[in-house]
Protein backbone atom coordinates (compact mmCIF):
# COMPACT_ATOMS: atom_id res chain seq x y z
CA UNK A 1 0.00 0.00 0.00
CA UNK A 2 1.34 3.40 -0.93
CA UNK A 3 1.10 6.01 1.81
CA UNK A 4 -1.51 8.67 1.14
CA UNK A 5 -0.01 11.58 -0.72
CA UNK A 6 -2.78 13.88 -1.82
CA UNK A 7 -3.81 15.06 1.61
CA UNK A 8 -0.95 14.11 3.89
CA UNK A 9 2.78 13.98 3.25
CA UNK A 10 3.93 14.94 -0.22
CA UNK A 11 7.56 15.24 -1.21
CA UNK A 12 9.75 15.40 -4.25
CA UNK A 13 12.37 17.31 -6.20
CA UNK A 14 10.99 20.57 -7.44
CA UNK A 15 12.99 23.67 -8.25
CA UNK A 16 10.36 26.37 -8.04
CA UNK A 17 10.34 29.84 -6.52
CA UNK A 18 8.37 29.33 -3.35
CA UNK A 19 7.08 31.97 -0.98
CA UNK A 20 10.08 31.25 1.25
CA UNK A 21 12.64 32.18 -1.38
CA UNK A 22 10.58 35.18 -2.45
CA UNK A 23 10.54 36.40 1.17
CA UNK A 24 14.29 35.85 1.49
CA UNK A 25 15.05 37.69 -1.75
CA UNK A 26 12.84 40.65 -0.81
CA UNK A 27 14.28 40.87 2.71
CA UNK A 28 17.84 40.70 1.34
CA UNK A 29 17.01 43.47 -1.11
CA UNK A 30 15.63 45.71 1.64
CA UNK A 31 18.68 45.04 3.83
CA UNK A 32 20.97 46.61 1.23
CA UNK A 33 19.42 50.00 2.08
CA UNK A 34 20.72 51.97 5.06
CA UNK A 35 18.05 52.53 7.70
CA UNK A 36 18.01 56.08 9.09
CA UNK A 37 15.61 55.35 11.93
CA UNK A 38 14.69 52.31 14.04
CA UNK A 39 13.24 49.63 11.80
CA UNK A 40 11.53 46.32 12.47
CA UNK A 41 11.59 43.54 9.90
CA UNK A 42 9.92 40.17 10.24
CA UNK A 43 10.67 37.47 7.70
CA UNK A 44 8.58 34.31 7.90
CA UNK A 45 9.37 30.97 6.32
CA UNK A 46 6.97 28.07 5.86
CA UNK A 47 9.50 25.26 5.42
CA UNK A 48 9.75 22.58 6.58
CA UNK A 49 5.95 22.54 6.73
CA UNK A 50 4.27 20.39 4.12
CA UNK A 51 4.49 19.82 1.24
CA UNK A 52 8.18 18.88 1.07
CA UNK A 53 8.99 19.90 -2.51
CA UNK A 54 12.52 21.28 -2.72
CA UNK A 55 15.38 21.43 -5.21
CA UNK A 56 17.23 18.14 -5.60
CA UNK A 57 20.46 19.58 -4.17
CA UNK A 58 18.85 19.68 -0.71
CA UNK A 59 17.80 16.02 -0.94
CA UNK A 60 21.32 15.13 -2.09
CA UNK A 61 22.71 16.38 1.24
CA UNK A 62 21.09 13.33 2.88
CA UNK A 63 21.82 10.07 1.03
CA UNK A 64 19.15 7.47 1.81
CA UNK A 65 21.87 4.96 2.75
CA UNK A 66 22.95 7.25 5.60
CA UNK A 67 19.49 7.85 7.06
CA UNK A 68 18.50 5.91 10.16
CA UNK A 69 14.86 5.51 11.08
CA UNK A 70 13.87 5.79 14.74
CA UNK A 71 13.88 2.54 16.67
CA UNK A 72 10.43 1.06 17.21
CA UNK A 73 10.56 -1.21 20.27
CA UNK A 74 7.33 -3.07 21.01
CA UNK A 75 7.08 -1.22 24.34
CA UNK A 76 7.52 2.24 22.78
CA UNK A 77 4.11 3.50 23.87
CA UNK A 78 4.19 1.99 27.37
CA UNK A 79 5.50 5.22 28.92
CA UNK A 80 2.78 7.37 27.35
CA UNK A 81 -0.24 8.06 29.58
CA UNK A 82 -3.66 7.11 28.23
CA UNK A 83 -4.52 10.80 27.72
CA UNK A 84 -1.43 11.16 25.53
CA UNK A 85 -2.33 8.11 23.45
CA UNK A 86 -5.89 9.40 23.04
CA UNK A 87 -4.70 12.84 21.94
CA UNK A 88 -2.31 11.33 19.40
CA UNK A 89 -5.07 9.06 18.06
CA UNK A 90 -7.51 11.96 17.72
CA UNK A 91 -5.02 13.97 15.69
CA UNK A 92 -4.06 10.94 13.61
CA UNK A 93 -7.59 10.40 12.32
CA UNK A 94 -8.81 11.18 8.85
CA UNK A 95 -6.14 11.30 6.17
CA UNK A 96 -3.42 10.55 8.74
CA UNK A 97 -5.09 7.38 10.04
CA UNK A 98 -2.78 4.40 9.64
CA UNK A 99 -0.15 6.56 7.98
CA UNK A 100 2.78 5.10 9.90
CA UNK A 101 1.91 1.54 8.92
CA UNK A 102 1.37 2.57 5.30
CA UNK A 103 4.66 4.42 4.97
CA UNK A 104 6.62 1.60 6.62
CA UNK A 105 4.94 -1.07 4.47
CA UNK A 106 5.63 0.96 1.32
CA UNK A 107 9.31 1.30 2.27
CA UNK A 108 9.10 5.11 2.13
CA UNK A 109 10.11 6.04 5.68
CA UNK A 110 13.69 6.99 4.82
CA UNK A 111 12.48 9.03 1.85
CA UNK A 112 10.10 10.97 4.10
CA UNK A 113 12.90 11.65 6.60
CA UNK A 114 15.15 12.74 3.75
CA UNK A 115 12.49 15.15 2.48
CA UNK A 116 11.96 16.66 5.93
CA UNK A 117 15.71 17.17 6.40
CA UNK A 118 15.91 18.67 2.89
CA UNK A 119 13.26 21.16 3.99
CA UNK A 120 15.27 22.13 7.04
CA UNK A 121 18.34 22.67 4.87
CA UNK A 122 16.28 24.69 2.40
CA UNK A 123 15.00 27.07 5.08
CA UNK A 124 18.54 27.30 6.46
CA UNK A 125 19.68 28.35 2.99
CA UNK A 126 16.90 30.94 2.71
CA UNK A 127 17.71 32.33 6.15
CA UNK A 128 21.39 32.41 5.21
CA UNK A 129 20.53 34.60 2.23
CA UNK A 130 18.87 37.12 4.56
CA UNK A 131 21.67 37.05 7.14
CA UNK A 132 24.34 37.41 4.45
CA UNK A 133 22.58 40.51 3.16
CA UNK A 134 22.37 41.92 6.67
CA UNK A 135 26.00 41.23 7.60
CA UNK A 136 27.29 42.54 4.25
CA UNK A 137 25.03 45.58 4.31
CA UNK A 138 25.03 48.94 6.07
CA UNK A 139 22.86 47.90 9.05
CA UNK A 140 24.82 45.01 10.58
CA UNK A 141 26.37 47.00 13.43
CA UNK A 142 23.05 48.22 14.83
CA UNK A 143 20.76 45.25 14.25
CA UNK A 144 19.41 42.61 16.60
CA UNK A 145 18.40 39.27 15.08
CA UNK A 146 15.81 37.13 16.86
CA UNK A 147 14.95 33.65 15.57
CA UNK A 148 12.11 31.41 16.68
CA UNK A 149 10.07 28.52 15.37
CA UNK A 150 6.73 27.05 16.24
CA UNK A 151 7.25 23.28 16.50
CA UNK A 152 8.86 20.25 14.99
CA UNK A 153 7.14 17.28 13.47
CA UNK A 154 6.99 13.69 14.62
CA UNK A 155 8.39 11.49 11.88
CA UNK A 156 7.36 8.02 13.00
CA UNK A 157 8.57 8.12 16.59
CA UNK A 158 6.15 6.11 18.70
CA UNK A 159 4.38 5.30 15.39
CA UNK A 160 3.23 8.93 15.17
CA UNK A 161 3.41 11.41 12.30
CA UNK A 162 2.47 15.04 12.48
CA UNK A 163 2.42 17.08 15.68
CA UNK A 164 -0.04 17.06 18.61
CA UNK A 165 1.57 14.58 20.98
CA UNK A 166 2.33 14.66 24.69
CA UNK A 167 5.90 13.48 24.34
CA UNK A 168 9.16 14.80 22.94
Q: Where in the sequence are the language-model features?
A:
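Active-site-proximal cap/lid insertion segments
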Residues: 1-21, 30-168
